[in-house]
């Protein structure tokens, strides 16, 4: 069957082999559609050859003065299509058949292959922190009653007032929590009085005839007990300590040195030392026992365990800053305040410090970077001076026990710091609040559902006929979405639906797709690929 189209183009004969059979017989290929390029698989080696057959007419699209009027599809810009000259068979423009734009206005796009759709759908991932914050905000928004419910129930304004108060309270608690977190990072200490008790006892020597037994027997006197000896005890406790947990005495010190009289005990046995180690067990006191029956002068050197560590400044820098012993951070702050007060920072190069005559004597330079100050300051810091206590160990038999008391200032952790840590770590109230929030969300959701049901029934009671028609239209739309129905069956069953301008292009696309399908089948059967 052959003939001519509406635009005067010859229609090729249709055979079961389609375009592939026509190409095998040497017939010219079907011309391309308006505004479409010929299929590259059908083009020959020549610039305008078709199927590689000599004498094939080159493709020439018709101009605007063609016999048929130009048709512009809805939604397309002018000039995007060539004039349509009747029914023509050719490769469609744009994407391949099945994935192109809708064939007619109002028709939804073709459904995507489920396998390809599955590849394009991103895999489920755990929510990011920003998404979790969004969920939290949505939860807060879910607690708000809609305006239509507030208008319907005036008493709900009391609930909205409570919700606004809760929001302000949450903001205040969050701000205080952040302030507590910042405060815990800084050392919170209090100065307390530590009372040190230094006491000694004396045990006189015993004669050989004091006991009926002999040394080494159960009734005798050991040889060590025959020699006079004294015992020195160093203990202490905090005064007015409100904490219930008693702190060990050794925990206040980094080291303890007891220096005895060198003339009595010699250069190798006159020092008793204790230094803190990582494995040190805390104790309530120290005890030293030595033989002797003479009064002994001793010196106690106590090195406090400062947390954070403190340092003693060079005398020149201490006089300049007015700081004797402080932490490194406090020393740096005092140094910066001195630089700022005396305007020693360079006006143009802000990272430099112009040294005055005092700084030149201390740092031995006329100018230095601010980043160099910690390195130069390290050579000017020393360990703090120990606490020195002079004590006399008495061996007077009439005074069996002598006790001396000394009060020193120590820094202990502020009890408020433990309370703040417990407040931040406490989750009891949070769990209770979370459970109440869940109940509120469920109640609000139930109220919204009841409001929807009320609106449904109210609309039905007001206009039953209009309501049922609108409801049926809505149900029909939902049914089409659920069942993936494409098109409009009510319009497609009428003949006028197929007399619209898009029908010609749709038929051309359909015929071209069939020709391509038959061509592929023929190539598969023959085992060759025609070019």
From Swiss-Prot:
Main location: nucleus
Domain SWIB/MDM2 stretches: 306-383
Posttranslational mods: Ubiquitinated through a signaling process involving RAC1 and the RING finger protein UNKL.
Bias type Low complexity, positions: 34-45
BP GO terms, sorted: chromatin remodeling; nucleosome disassembly; regulation of transcription by RNA polymerase II
SMART domains: SWIB
Highest rank taxon of the organism: Eukaryota
UniProt entry tagged with the keyword Glycoprotein: no
Positions of crosslink type Glycyl lysine isopeptide (Lys-Gly) (interchain with G-Cter in SUMO2): 226
Cellular component annotations (GO), alphabetically ordered: nucleoplasm; nucleus; SWI/SNF complex
Region span, Disordered: 20-85, 202-226
Asymmetric dimethylarginine modified-residue sites: 81, 104
Positions where Phosphoserine occurs in the chain: 203
Swiss-Prot/TrEMBL keywords: Chromatin regulator, Isopeptide bond, Methylation, Nucleus, Phosphoprotein, Transcription, Transcription regulation, Ubl conjugation
Modified residues (Phosphothreonine): 217
Cross-referenced InterPro entries: SMARCD2_SWIB_dom, SWIB_domain, SWIB_MDM2_dom_sf, SWIB_MDM2_domain
Function field: Involved in transcriptional activation and repression of select genes by chromatin remodeling (alteration of DNA-nucleosome topology). Component of SWI/SNF chromatin remodeling complexes that carry out key enzymatic activities, changing chromatin structure by altering DNA-histone contacts within a nucleosome in an ATP-dependent manner. Critical regulator of myeloid differentiation, controlling granulocytopoiesis and the expression of genes involved in neutrophil granule formation.
Similarity comment: Belongs to the SMARCD family.
Subunit structure: Component of the multiprotein chromatin-remodeling complexes SWI/SNF: SWI/SNF-A (BAF), SWI/SNF-B (PBAF) and related complexes. The canonical complex contains a catalytic subunit (either SMARCA4/BRG1/BAF190A or SMARCA2/BRM/BAF190B), and at least SMARCE1, ACTL6A/BAF53, SMARCC1/BAF155, SMARCC2/BAF170, and SMARCB1/SNF5/BAF47. Other subunits specific to each of the complexes may also be present permitting several possible combinations developmentally and tissue specific.
Protein name (Swiss-Prot/TrEMBL): SWI/SNF-related matrix-associated actin-dependent regulator of chromatin subfamily D member 2
Native species: Rattus norvegicus (Rat)
